[in-house]
Amino acid sequence: MSLLARLFGEKKKTAEIAKNRLSLLIAHERSGGAGTADFLPALQKDLIDVISKYVNVNPDDIKVQLDKQDNVEVLEVNIVLPEHGR
């Protein structure tokens, strides 16, 4: 471990974060989707944080919804991006 990592702590790697999110989704799928999708608020907050790094977006313009169509659950993410040049 480097001196800087010891002083400032190590930042979680993107791959590790993605792995944790995927594990959460797989666990939800294996449980049969019973109950409400408890992870949606956390997922929406993570999306807002990541998108805000690259685009100035209103948090209210990011919607995350989980729908069931036949035997398939569909995770829908709608993001209203600001218009440029106006």
UniProtKB/Swiss-Prot annotation:
GO biological process: cell division; regulation of division septum assembly
A family per Pfam: MinE
InterPro entries from the UniProt entry: MinE, MinE_sf
HAMAP family per UniProt: MinE
SUPFAM superfamilies (UniProt xref): Cell division protein MinE topological specificity domain
Keyword Cell cycle: yes
Species of provenance: Azoarcus sp. (strain BH72)
NCBIfam families: minE (TIGR01215), PRK00296.1 (NF001422), PRK13989.1 (NF010595)
Biological role stated in the UniProt entry: Prevents the cell division inhibition by proteins MinC and MinD at internal division sites while permitting inhibition at polar sites. This ensures cell division at the proper site by restricting the formation of a division septum at the midpoint of the long axis of the cell.
Keywords on record: Cell cycle, Cell division
Residues spanning the membrane: none
Presence of the UniProt keyword Cell cycle in the record: yes
Name by which UniProt lists this protein: Cell division topological specificity factor
Family according to the record: Belongs to the MinE family.
